[in-house]
Amino acid sequence: MAAYNAPVSNCQFRLTHILPIPQRQGAPTDPFQMNAIRQQSDSAEPLRHDIRLLGRCLGEVIQACEGKRVYDTIETLRRTAVRFRRAGDPADDKLLQARVKQLRGNDPNSVARAFSYFLHLSNIAEDRDQNRRQRDRALAGAGPERGSLRQAIESLKAQGVNNARIRRLLSEACVMPVLTAHPTEVQRKSTLDVHREISSLLVQRERELTADELSELDLALIGQVATLWQTRMLRYTRLTVADEIENALSYYRSTFLNVIPRVYGDLARLLNREPVKPFTPPPPPLEPFLRMGSWIGGDRDGNPNVDAATLERALLRQATVLFEHYLQEVHALGAELSASTLLIEADPALLALADAGGDDSPHRRDEPYRRALIGIYARLAATARHLTGQELARRATVPAAPYDTPDALAADLAVIAASLSAHHGAPIARLRLSGLQQAVTVFGFHLATVDLRQSSDVHERVLAELFARAGDGIDGQAVDYLALDEAARVAVLRRELAHARPLASPWIAYSEETASELAVLRAAAAGRARYGRQAVLQSIVSHTETLSDLLEVLVLQKEAGLIAPPGETIAPGDGLMVVPLFETIPDLQRGPEIMAAWLDLPEVRQRVRLAQGDTQEVMLGYSDSNKDGGFLTSNWSLYQAERALVDVFSARSVRLRMFHGRGGSVGRGGGSSYDAILAQPPGTVAGQLRLTEQGEVIQSKYKDAEVGRWHLELLVAATLESSLAPQAAATSAEDAHMQQHAPAMSFMSELAQRTYRGLVYDTPGFADYFFAATPISEIAGLNIGSRPASRKKGQHIEDLRAIPWGFSWAQCRLMLTGWYGMGSAIEAYLETGAQGAPRSRRARLAQLREMASDWPAFRTLLSNMEMVLAKSDLAIAAGYAQLVPRRGLRERVFGAITAEHGRTLAMLRLLTRRELLADNPGLMASLRERFAYIDPLNYLQIELIKRHRAAQRRAGDDADIRVPRAIHLTINGIAAGLRNSD
């Protein structure tokens, strides 16, 4: 699928170009804003070469598998799309649409697969190019790249921050990406595995090769592309929670288990005062601060498929994968550490460990390291068998008792490391041993922390039933919990926390909902006892609106035996941290007040101090607040909430840990993670950061090990910089920005929310428009997640989940969640101003331009919006609008969207004084390449939706199953092309 002057065969299928294309523009297509196009154009040739190579392979596969007619059909569509993008002739656009409409039979599926797979292959090439560029920079001796650990450490040292201070922060820090399973992950694990193989082959092709070696690699590449083509892209059945658990675990095998210890090792070397020499001991393992979290198996909010059994399965499967890794690494160490006491000495502690290992083979009598590792392997195997009930990997050759804790395993590994260092063995197995040591401190016996999450209204109903079924057995009086006001509820819940007697009875048959909730909490208690407390640490309360929403979870924990009974000493790590999730605009505004009340309760403050180390986590929801109030109001409300929370926590000497519920799309808090962290208000990071990694973003960031390593490095570097850069100046500057610009932001936020809600919630028939003009109904039918797309049946915007809401707008190329309302807000401020604003329009414009250049929060907001606007395409969106049968509704809604889009573009140009992405021409050029391959998919999706819905109206179902499958293929391809669209 590429134009290249050295084709693999006679196939001339060309599906890539490097051409200037006017008019339609786009946005970054991966989480790193495409490192490949941040460089000068003359360094883009390796990327062009890889895309051409993969395109040729795909073209040859299509011609061989589907025949010349199908190949020619696809190539004709490609040429038409490229010609339109090159010259902007509307006639070519009409011709492209006409040719798409003529597709019949299985051709729509073949076309959708061809363009989708080309976009997948382009993503692989771009990820590989990013790795290549970073290596080239290092080889050239260039300065550290922005966002790298080296750049962060050097920057901090230049500002007077010494190593001791950095280490002190790391000893108390928490950086935790949290993988979530949301209904926007449209790629199968089978295809992701092939992607990794293709990436590996591209790496091998960069070596100096003989002609035969190159030929073999090219054949292997074609084989992998053929495998991709012959592998079913779609799932026939909806994902189960068990499937989602396995999908997530594949990223641990490919990336996290090996890459996270390397990130620690890189940081340790940067903090080491002296360069590491071959025979000097390696830096000791750092205190664990970078860990992984997961919602998969524990997130019950709106997912009836998650219960105690899925939580147990998640914990079991995580431990299984982890112990397989440990056993594999220990076995490999045994092969590497062949040192003989006939040639080198060993520490007494190492000799004792070897003697205790149980291996009495005369062939290894003089090999204490191997004998010690045989014993460690046996103990690990026994531990795995004890915790998982399975025999993993190779059977141990000697009997052994299991390890009680990860610390015991770490101690044995430390004995080996110390002996090697003391006897000229430091270079031997340095990377593997130090990596394993660090892995044990990070992953323990649990691998990742699984969060529990449930909606506050479920907790409310469960408590109401427990009180109702207890009757007057509660201190001689019945409690009608649902009838109580907030103050009475708080009083009742606090009374329950003070009583040792249980509220629930094992002799009462509770409703399915209540029984399930109690079972989940008991499963969490059992999991913590089995795998360690790190296995489950948080209980997140969705839709937190009141203080009682948090107290309810403490009472339920008491019923499940998770927290110490009243009167007993609260030990460190006791119970699960109750984490509020503030999602809507009103909840964000109430959040600081709720947290102040929470921390002021004596029993809560004692728990925070003793069990949680004076740390309290608060989660902020980006997607729901955006769906509720629109892009600007969501961002401004989040920003204000964070600042207010810092004040609340600082006044009470409690460490605040923010948990950012971000997604891939800008409307859900996406964009550059590095820039987003640095743009947080001063004091909100302070070494504490959790954030969700969701949907398509997981595979974009972590499918490739090196890309995953870079992203983790970005998170750590940004956390260090944000936490340790001199705070006084930053706080002073931020206070000045707030004092000067907060009235303008509040004015624009109110106007933007009014504009947004006026369209989405106050326009009669808007829900009908949305369900007709986007593929939301088709997305709901795609087997891409275990959780339903809507909370309730029916077509109501309020009931629709925020994630498929944003995903649908991305599919139709409007990206409405990332910009709508901004144009009206800026225009209104320029025309009328807020109270206390500069008097003249010119002065107000100067103020907004100053905000755009000097205030990180506003600058990042505009930058993210600019990327979204560049990616949107009103011409294609107009085709989706034609799916709305009511002309008046169509014209009213799409007319409002078009007007606001134009207004927002004009206001952005006015503030930035340039065209979209004019400061990043490489980025724009790369996006333009993609559009010629996304456009046909959009047009095909529109046509297929028309056919599908017409067939449903005629027969109540689609007689031709190929049509809905082809729609789903286009959804996959468009998501691959846009990447951060969930």
From Swiss-Prot:
Cited InterPro entries: PEP_COase, PEP_COase_bac/pln-type, PEP_COase_Lys_AS, PEPCASE_His_AS, Pyrv/PenolPyrv_kinase-like_dom
BP GO terms, sorted: carbon fixation; oxaloacetate metabolic process; tricarboxylic acid cycle
Record's keyword annotation contains Lipid biosynthesis: no
PROSITE patterns the record matches: PEPCASE_1, PEPCASE_2
Catalytic activity: oxaloacetate + phosphate = phosphoenolpyruvate + hydrogencarbonate
Active-site residue list: H182, K627
Entry keyword set: Carbon dioxide fixation, Lyase, Magnesium
Needed cofactors: Mg(2+)
HAMAP family for the chain: PEPcase_type1 (MF_00595)
Protein name: Phosphoenolpyruvate carboxylase
Lineage: Bacteria, Pseudomonadati, Pseudomonadota, Betaproteobacteria, Burkholderiales
Gene: ppc
